[in-house]
A protein has these predicted regions:
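N-terminal signal peptide c-region/cleavage motif recognized by signal peptidases
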Residues: 17-18
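Transmembrane beta-barrel domains of Gram-negative outer membranes and organellar outer membranes
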Residues: 21-173
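Short linear sequence elements within intrinsically disordered, low-complexity coil regions
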Residues: 10-11, 39
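Sec-dependent signal peptide recognition
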Residues: 2-10
Length: 173
């Protein structure tokens, strides 16, 4: 009964809406807490969204691989289109995903994410740490990410942010 209560509380919190102040960040990925032994990954993500009369475009290229059975490291190069419609390098990132529990070991699967980012040609730095959660029930799964982000540098006001992401999936087959 206790597990059902916590699961329902998490699901209902995904639908709760409150006034928030956001800095224009668009969620482009919900992370899962799983790492496979000998996993290698090449990733390309394209992100486009409307900003007033223009559209913002960013691309992320990454290579990653597991360094232990439960730890994966990825290296990202980020490119963005600027105000003059020129596409150029904008940031570098190193991301580490750590699987804390084996899949199915506990009532939910848990992991951590750590990320370090540097904006190209600016004194802007960002460090992120987050908790990754996934619960599978039958054909459905719920993934929740909770991140704490700290930005600092001479070209940005130092700030701490919190970010939440969620994904609910139903597997048809």
């Amino acid at each position: 009964m206790k597990k059902l209560f916590y699961t329902l509380a998490i699901i209902l919190s995904c639908f709760y809406s409150a006034q928030t102040l956001a800095d224009g960040v668009v969620v482009d990925k919900v992370y899962h807490p799983y790492v496979l032994p000998n996993e290698k990954e090449v990733e390309w993500r394209l992100l486009s969204h409307q900003k007033g009369n223009t559209n913002s475009l960013a691309q992320r290229f990454a290579y990653g691989q597991s360094i232990f059975d439960n730890v994966m490291v990825e290296f990202y190069i980020v490119g963005e289109r600027d105000v003059d419609d020129n596409f150029s390098l904008s940031a570098y990132e190193v991301e580490t995903r750590w699987m804390l529990t084996e899949q199915g070991e506990y009532w939910a699967d848990w992991g951590m994410l750590f990320e370090f980012e540097k904006i190209h040609n600016k004194d802007i730095w960002e460090v992120t740490s987050g908790l990754l959660f996934e619960k599978e029930v039958g054909r459905t799964s719920l993934s929740i990410n909770a991140f704490l982000i700290y930005e600092w540098g001479n070209d940005i006001e130092n700030e701490m942010e919190m970010e939440f992401r969620a994904q609910y999936r139903y597997r048809w087959i």
